[in-house]
Amino acid sequence: MAKSHLLPWLLLLPILCGPGTAAAITYSLACAQGPEFWCQSLEQALQCRALGHCLQEVWGHVEADDLCQECENISRLLTKMAKEAIFQDSVRKFLEQECDVLPLKLLAPLCRHLLDTYFPLIIEHFQSHMNPKFICQHVGLCKPRHPEPGKGPEPWGPLLDKLALPLLPGVPQAKPGPQTQDLSEQLFPIPIPYCWLCRTLIKRIQAVIPKGVLAMTVAQVCHVVPLLVGGICQCLVERYSVILLDTLLGRMLPQLVCGLVLRCSSEDSAGPALPALGSVPGEWLPQDSDCQLCMFVTTQAGNSSEQATPQAMRQACLGTWLDRQKCERFVEENAPRLQTLVSSGWDAHMACQALGTCAAPFSPLQCVHSPHF
């Protein structure tokens, strides 16, 4: 009888202890390889208790190759997200709602048609064709590499073949531009600003992608190390994750999507070209208005109890200088995360940095400070 009660626990024991034990043994053996293995990633440095060595001897400065590697890592993460059915459904529903609230009602059916036609193709392309190395070369974070002998051209071709634009009259085919003037006038009473519409939808997609959550997920590993080292770890995460996510989402999506689907010029779809590697100008950082909105809402709710914080944030949106609709949308999307950060002792600026709406200057000497560092 005793055996029958003991058996389930014996079966559970490998599940509860096995992975951690096996991982510890694996890392113990791997750490014996020395610094070359320790400093390949933050996780390996922590597991081998060599974070201090890696910070001082290997990670002391941010080089162009570091940015390239981090860009590729984040691109793989975003591409993986694009493959998730739940994420696709959320983005699709969100964009359909955005189509319905466009200021010019005439554009709503066209916007829906744009989604119906091209959303599945773009998702399929990200799933099967998009290469992180190519993405990061395209946005200027990796140096261009010459194609290896025997390999085909860079992966614009497959999507361009599919997006022959058979269903969208009036799309510019030869000379790209912000509007479809002098095209398809017999079908639409006004020129249809396809590139503007594309840019508008792409910017709204960025609100669905949880930049702050992704950066905070990376930062979770910092909590398993001593406080001082944990603060340095948080500094590294701030330097890489949030800045690169802002860069990739703000520059990559308009260039890749609007440039491919509608042949919008880079000036129309993504603003000026990216600067050379090694410099990260202030324009890469989040817009001041978004940062100010986050700071204001968080500050106004800072003195409230944990239960009253969401209501206090919504009340803050009644401020006369705020865009109320934008503020309420921001609170709806971010209140739970902000509440968690504020209740943990983070001030408004730190919380908004972690959320991704505010960012510190990109400098090895200036990092976000957690309550413990």
UniProtKB/Swiss-Prot annotation:
Entry GO terms, CC: alveolar lamellar body; extracellular space; lysosome; membrane; multivesicular body
Residues annotated as domain Saposin B-type: 64-146, 191-268, 287-362
Pfam families: SapA, SapB_2
Location of this chain's protein in the cell: Secreted, Extracellular space, Surface film
Disulfide bonds listed in the record: C68-C142, C71-C136, C99-C111, C195-C264, C198-C258, C222-C233, C291-C358, C294-C352, C317-C327
Residues of this chain annotated as glycosylated in UniProt: N73, N303
Keyword entries, A-Z: Disulfide bond, Gaseous exchange, Glycoprotein, Repeat, Secreted, Signal, Surface film
Propeptide: 23-187, 267-373
InterPro entries for this protein: SAP_A, SapB_2, Saposin, Saposin-like, SaposinB_dom, Sphingo_Act-Surfact_Prot
Family annotation (Gene3D superfamilies): Saposin-like
Chief localisation class: secreted
Residues in Saposin A-type domain copies: 24-64
Domain of life: Eukaryota
Signal peptide: 1-22
An example Gene Ontology biological process: sphingolipid metabolic process
Quaternary context: Homodimer; disulfide-linked.
Record function comment: Pulmonary surfactant-associated proteins promote alveolar stability by lowering the surface tension at the air-liquid interface in the peripheral air spaces. SP-B increases the collapse pressure of palmitic acid to nearly 70 millinewtons per meter.
UniProt miscellaneous comment: Pulmonary surfactant consists of 90% lipid and 10% protein. There are 4 surfactant-associated proteins: 2 collagenous, carbohydrate-binding glycoproteins (SP-A and SP-D) and 2 small hydrophobic proteins (SP-B and SP-C).
Identification of the protein by name: Pulmonary surfactant-associated protein B
Species of the source: Bos taurus
Gene: SFTPB
